[in-house]
């Protein structure tokens, strides 16, 4: 018997749970639409990275197998088979929601159903807003098929010269920055590509439009960097980013159009060349023909529309923890260690702490890691302001996938302001979220530390659940300062920490030690692990052994889980759950009954435990430990948003009509109370 679930199929099962939220009829309509948008965006990234990686392994005949022993070719086929039916489910769900929205006054209307007055408005919009932005190409001997960047959205048409009657083909590129949903009247929306299609004869004068279809390509978007050869890492990353849009096509999505048109499009894609003059290889490319609009990720335009707030869940306002109501946050932290649970408790104290440090004349230095901070960051702006007055040292991780460009921008801005900027660590990704502020008061140095499971990003802090820890304890600050010095000298793996635990050197051995300790207690042992993913085979094997010793184990794994629970003789004492709701579960909390409870930036994956700089923090303060434990206890009682994984790999909703509990709703209501 295979002891592990396939990683890729387990991720797809997570995205299925996202799709299930779109099917939840108890949710407001735009909330359901939001989950369709998330589903599609997730799938885009899955193809850009995971499928692209498998395709590379297959085409280069690299004998690399998944944790379950499946070859790249087998995994590609399993992915295609898994999605074949689910893509249809997604289309049906969109059509259902679209019909319900129509009754509420939000109409996504096909162009051919518009009346004459509405078509006149569409024509005016085309001339004023679209004509100058679309890029039409007639494909002939002097105009070959142009390169297509990743996530290109375009129209492909068959056209006929009215004078010569010669038939040819045309490509019309639509820029990504245009509004996809054009509101012609209040509540009446038409897709931009349908407006363009209706006016193609204004782009191709003296031609008749015979056939047309929309299509979209997804390309390999992973960045391969040879760090050994990097003399200027920022410059190397900048050059690598320019190559991202030139990857091989891994997926083609098409809308309506004849089979003949599709065949011609495929032939054109096979023949055109990229900027590097390497032909695209379309072998194994996944092709999906859609009955609905392409790219449901653009539904965010409607979800965020200000006129339809009644069709969304009410916005929750995170509460300010009472200990942070004082003007001087540093005094609050000196009094006691504090733990916030975002987004239920506000992220504002984190921003305020950095802003206060930047403007406080007693501040001597700020040391901080930045992983994903977003495009408009008040935190980075405060660091830039501080850099002209005090010592600011920032490690900006340029390898944070899909945030590389934003991080590069902020790193350059910090450098210009006078901050010391380090662009990551050689062959490691710095994923630990840490901040230490050093002040001088009463002729003494005082250190204030912030550690988190989530990013220093105010926007994601409103939609991700994370825990955020503040301390003025010297032993914690000393460990963080020691780690910063290691990072600045590129010796991140050389020194072990004393109070905290770091990857790649300490976390995995510590977790194994903690599992072994519970094994010594046999049936009295108990473990709860809450993480985003469980993939590491060594950790899984130790959990299997613990189960066989009688240790009861509850796993709350939001996404990928390669462990097989409830298998007789292997894992019958292990239960695996997943919670998918309005917020993205992101906190990692690890509880061992006979030892302690910990929180961490690290998931239980080889990349986190072996190839990243991560932190595992013990909750030595009883109040904080109890708060973390209460989070786990409530989530294990969730009967509305919790799924259970069985030994066959299927997830089913946990329900109890007599005791309905949505853990995320509970935490909203109980914010600032003792959970």
Annotate the PLM regions.
Residues 552-556:
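Hydrophobic alpha/beta core scaffold segments
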